[in-house]
């Protein structure tokens, strides 16, 4: 499986940075923001963060997210991609090998529907009213 089989690279380019997260050898979570680029081959290359702890290679998460504040209050344009996988070091970068993905974009699935679908009762309700919405 290639990166582009799991991750929509066009949508990924809409994000400006990623938050690299892992669990250290003592069992504590550690997170650091880092820049990223896509290689010509469609590989996700994270700028190697300068951190004083050992970065594991076998299991990391990278959160790419965006949110726009509304001056009068509230938020819009919310979206995220959470990619779990492995990394290898490559010329000052960490090459991400995606294994799992979860994502949400409110332009695709509005927030109220996301909340309703997250709850079993909400899913049943949406299924029951869907025919009347499509009519």
Regions flagged by a language model, labelled:
Residues 1-135:
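Binding-site signature for planar aromatic cofactors or substrates
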């Amino acid at each position: 499986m290639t990166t582009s089989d799991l991750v929509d690279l066009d949508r990924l380019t809409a994000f400006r940075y990623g938050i690299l997260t892992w669990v250290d050898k003592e069992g504590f979570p550690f997170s650091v923001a880092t820049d990223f680029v896509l290689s010509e081959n469609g590989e996700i290359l994270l700028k190697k963060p300068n951190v004083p702890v050992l970065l594991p290679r076998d299991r990391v998460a990278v959160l790419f997210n965006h949110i726009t504040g509304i001056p009068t209050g509230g938020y819009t344009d919310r979206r995220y991609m959470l990619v779990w996988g492995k990394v290898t070091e490559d010329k000052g970068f960490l090459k991400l090998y995606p294994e799992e993905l979860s994502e949400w974009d409110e332009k695709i699935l509005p927030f109220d529907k996301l909340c309703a679908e997250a709850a079993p009762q909400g899913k049943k309700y949406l299924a029951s009213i869907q025919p009347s919405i499509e009519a």
